[in-house]
Structure formats: C-alpha cells, structure tokens
Amino acid sequence: GGVQQKMLDSVNLISDLGSKKDLQNMIDSAEEKGIAVYLNGITNYAMDSGITDGFFVYTDAAKFVSQESAKLNVYDTVTYEKAEEDRDPFYLLKADLVYEMMDNLADAANGYHAGVSFSDIGYELSSDFYQKDPTSRQMAMEEQAEKLKSLDDNGTDIMINMGNDYAVAYADMVTNMDLEGTEYSIIDKKIPFYQLAIHGYVNYTGEALNLTQNTQNELLNSAEYGAGLAFTFMKESAFELQNTLYTEYFGADYSAWHDEMLEIYTRYNEELG
C-alpha cells in the first residue's frame, strides 16, 4: 500500500493506520451516513519489490517490442531526464496479471462491504509485446471492459480514474475527469460533449480542488460541467512533506483546508444542488 505500492497479489493493512476492525468500523459508520467508501489500488504497475513479495520481473512484467521487460521511470519535469536518483523505477504488468490484481482488490473490498477504486483502469491502456502471448491495446480495452462488467454484474461498486468511455458504463464514480481540455489549441469556446452525454448516468468529479493548480477555475468548471467536488486530505501537517518526493500533496493538510472546504461545499450545494 501507500504511495509506492508493491504488486497487488494480496491486500494488507498498514498497521500504523489501524486494524481491520478499525477499517470496518469506519466503513460501517460512513455507510450509516450515506457515504460510500472505495478501497483504492494500482493494478497495472508494480515496484520491483522482489520475488519474496510475489514479483518476478522476467515472468510478471510486460515486454517492449525489443523483448526487454517494460521497466518505466519517472522523468524530471524541468530537465526531462530520468529521475533515477530520486524515484525508483516500476514495471508494467502482463495483461493476465492485471486482471488477477483487479480481482484481488475487488475481493478485499467486498470483504469489507466497500467499493473498489482502480487508479489506472479506465484511464490507461498498454500493449504487451511478449512473443508467445502478445496483447494489443484494443485487446486490453476489450478485456478491461469485460472484467469491469463482471465486477459490476456481481454487485461491486466501482470507481475509476479519468473515465474513458469503455469503462464508464460499469462505473459508479469517476474521479479526476478532465474538465479543462487541451491548452494547446487556440479556440473560442468549449462545449462539454462528453459530460453532456454521461450526466445523470454516472457521478464524476474533476481534480481535487486543494491540489489543482487553479482552484477557482476547477471549481467553476465543475459547476459548468455538472461535476461533483473532490478534495484529497491527510491528517498530518503539510510540513511533513518537506524534503520528500511527494510535495504535490502539499495542499492536502486537512486542518488548513477545513473551513474553506465547508464554505465551498455549502455554497455549491445551496446554489447548484
């Protein structure tokens, strides 16, 4: 778990955050208040955690055209160089392993009577050029949709990221939907065709208001496009993130945002609810 998740061959709680009973109590309490809880995980990728944690590069990672394992790196946004000294590389998983990880996460969520949230399903599609069992992006799309349909048919509540159309039909919630569009085109007006098509069929939000680069624009776009509001919070102070690799969460300090969040939600519900 956490921000550097290992391969999702099993779902274990972080003991510092509480026990299984604590998590179940939280979910039950939320349900009593009409709040849905989703357990989130990454299923397309894995850190090289080693064979003792269930990951073996040569059998579990997808392949490039060169037949090398699909090892991926984070790149520096300023220099465009690999951030090898700061960030550990990670691997794209083979397609059949991705669907196994989806089942593992869904089974864990169902065990707590919670929904399942996929960080990368319905958002990213990848090929696997393994010569003995290649997978095209078209095949991956069809297989992802089939797996999502199976989970949906079994009564599992599903949350996805971004919301590509092949996955939206099976989702109960879409987060981080792009409400802005490309900034590279010179255009006079924007028409939210996608949001017009799905509005009323699935709930969706834009980026977390406290993490986006322009909170006011994201809020106005949410109102215009019929989106819900999203925030990302943590209990600890933002100062805990200083000199770490995760300063993108600097705005996630709950205590710093509490009053403004309530004000935004209250006005949004009163004027648009």
Residue ranges and their predicted role:
Residues 1-53, 57, 139-149:
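Aromatic- and glycine-enriched glycan-recognition loops and surfaces
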Residues 43-114, 122-273:
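Active-site-proximal substrate-binding groove within the catalytic cores of carbohydrate-active enzymes
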